[in-house]
Amino acid sequence: MKELDRLLDRIIQRVNINLRELAYDVSPLVQKLIPFNQMTKFYAFYGITPHHPLNLQFRNSNLAGSYFLGKCSVTNSLLYKSDIRGDELKQKADTFKYQEYEIPLDEDEEIEIEDSFLIKTLVHNFSHDPETLEKFFIKDTISTHYANIHGSPSNGCFLGPFSTVDLTTIRDCLAGTFSYIQAGEVSHLNIEPGTVWVRVPDTFNFMYRFPLQRLSNYIYFTAGNSPQGIFIDFVEDRKEAFQRVFNVVNLEPSVSVPSSASLDRFAVIKPKTHISENVLVSQRAYLQNAWLGKGANAQEQSYIINSRLEGNDITAHGAKIIEADLGKDVFVGFNCFLRGRPESRLTIGKESIIMPHTIVDIHKPLSIPAGHLVWGLIADEKELESNSMPLKDFAKIDTRFSKGNMVFEGSGAEFVTAFKGRIRHILEANGAFFNGHSNKGHAQQNQNISFNTIQPYPQGEKEGLFPTIIIRP
């Protein structure tokens, strides 16, 4: 495994060079975070469909347990159980609109991963940077457990566990544990753990910071240790269910799936689960006694347990919904943790927006009214009051406003409009509005994927490295 050692040292050095202005050394956090014997045990796999351009290139890298779809190149990198999902990449002749510009693409977009270490990380969407529309790059970057790199080119960064960088070009930055950044473009920043930051320059700025002592019950990460807390325990308790999914070659769906819906081969479906028309269930999703109404979706690393989603509900990447009832058109953002109890269920009214990285963890029944914006850390009615607002009231904000640990500046109307527009786009992209003839999306186009596996050198100096592989039509 000497080559894996050299490769990790190379990646650590390159990231440290990029972070030198922040005086940050990633080595104590990363060394031995994933034992190398784990990185030799798992195959990688890729999907082929008639809808997505195929061009995969792997050089001098480990890809253990990782999944690839669409155009992607990986060079001098370590990818452990990560999902590189290129089904939303822009294609040749597409036009990208940015401010007053309409920019045509000369070639298909490609995800380009170089000198990076991604651990159980999701890479999805497409580059929103007008300077690099055809290259969704991830370079000199280390991303730890259950982070999301969503439409966010990254160079010289460290992403803590359960962090999300969303629609943001990020350079030479630290994204702290459980932080969420959607800010357009950032560089040379140390973003503290538990920060939720949504910004459109000159339009609005939403900022919330979790109380770190309480957040540490859910997730904390220190040098020399693996991530720990309720989030990790929750996932680890259900890990065995995924082992069967990945060990069996041919696995028939255990539930009825309508012809307009898509159930990924690598999702876990437990008994008493119902899937309606136009539903999308992505790889590594986990459903148990879950009722998904028409147009609902469960994205990567999401968990829906003993819960009912009435329809057109979005469960974003990494979100967890337990013992809850959601009305129609509810958005649950990245890495949310919504947990009711069997005798104390959580109810969320229709058309509500649960901000990314929101924690609702209750021991008494709690009802969130329809049309509300919710954020922060909520354990009871009192905390719901200080961490939520009706969307119609939030839209009236036109200056600085604060409530609890949340501070907002700018136009509330623009904020609400932007969120609603994005929710509409997600539903469209996922095929929620398919009518039998038009408006196809992932739920319809991801139904027929053929999967192929690739494996690393089994022993010798190159043990754990995958050979150079180029896969083209």
Enumerate the language-model features and the residues they cover.
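Extended low-complexity, polyampholyte segments enriched in Ser/Thr/Pro and acidic residues
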Residues: 1-10, 14-17, 27-50
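Glycine-rich hexapeptide-repeat left-handed beta-helix
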Residues: 11-28, 83-138, 145, 149-154, ...
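Extracellular beta-rich repeat passengers
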Residues: 40-42, 46-64, 68-69, 73-78, ...
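Eukaryote-specific, low-hydrophobicity, charge-rich regions
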Residues: 44, 52-58, 237, 241-263, ...
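Short, conserved secondary-structure segments in the cores of folded domains
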Residues: 70, 109, 251-253, 265, ...
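Beta-propeller domains
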Residues: 258-289, 293-295, 299-300
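Transmembrane alpha-helical segments and their membrane-interface loop/helix boundaries
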Residues: 464, 472-473
